[in-house]
Each structure stands twice: as C-alpha cells, then as structure tokens.
A protein has these predicted regions:
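Hydrophobic alpha-helical segments
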Residues: 1-157
Length: 157
C-alpha cells in the first residue's frame, strides 16, 4: 500500500493466475485502502486506532458484474461512463476521473469506498474559494501543496 509503484501489470496478472478473481482483487483493494485511510486519519487526529474484528462477517458475495464491464484503461475490468448501466446511473454525474472508475467492477465496494472518500476530499471539479471560511492560504494553494506532497510520495493515479 505504501508503494503503489510496485503494483505492475505483471504483478496483477500473477495474482489472477494464482487464482485471485478480478472482483476479489477489487474487494481486497477497496478494503485495504479504506482501512489505510481510517488508520492514517485516526493517527493524524491523535485518536485511538480502530481494532479490526477477529473474524469476517458470514455471507455470500453477490458475484454479479455490472453492465458494460470491459478491460481498461488499466489492467482490471471497469465500466466506462458511456457503458454504465443502472447500478452506476448517478456515479458518473459529476464528471469522470479515472480514479472514480477504478472500482466499478464491484459497485458495492465502489460505493463503500466513495462514501469515505467523499467525506475526506474536497469536491471536484473546480477549486473555488469557500465563502465565509477564513484561512491563511487560498484553496488553490491548499490544492497545490496537496499535489506536491502527492508527487513527493509517488501517490499517482
């Protein structure tokens, strides 16, 4: 998780050849990312770390693919805005960025991931000043600093 540069097309292919299903890969990716975000946020806030449960909840996975699934633009199957079916109707209504497309193979994980991300991130697409919010630097400067930090940490998507 700390080194996204190690996730290559060859590595992804080796996971699939080893028996990890494409939708399982997306679920693992989503859960790992959500847990990392929660851990880093609680650490940054100085709060107590959240403990993971000792066992997973019992249940059966849906194992159903949304309409319009195709490989690309990366290595795993996704659904493009043009091919999105009813389960993704309102997902692409605010523009299309490839990171938003990355988990579309498993809509439940997509929604779980973005419920968290939407609460942690500033809204897209414009970098507007927030009316009535006083601070020392502008929102554009905040976004610039975030971009530089992301580049420094090799956090690219």
């Amino acid at each position: 998780m700390a080194d996204p540069g190690r996730i290559t097309e060859g590595w992804y292919a080796s996971m699939i050849l080893a028996g990890v299903l494409e939708d399982e890969y997306i679920e693992i990716l989503s859960v790992a990312t959500i847990v990392t975000c929660v851990d880093v946020f609680t650490l940054g806030m100085g709060a107590e770390q959240v403990s993971l449960p000792d066992s997973a909840e019992a249940g059966k996975l849906a194992r159903s693919r949304p309409v319009g699934v195709a490989i690309g633009p990366g290595w795993s199957p996704t659904v493009s805005p043009e091919d999105a079916g009813p389960e993704l109707d309102d997902f692409y209504d605010h523009g299309h960025q490839y990171i938003r497309r990355s988990l579309t193979l498993v809509p439940d994980e997509l929604n779980r991931f973005w419920r968290l991300m939407n609460s942690l991130c500033m809204a897209n697409p414009a970098v507007n000043e927030l009316v009535g919010v006083e601070r020392s630097i502008s929102r554009a400067q905040i976004e610039f600093i975030a971009t530089r930090v992301s580049a420094h940490l090799d956090c690219c998507y």
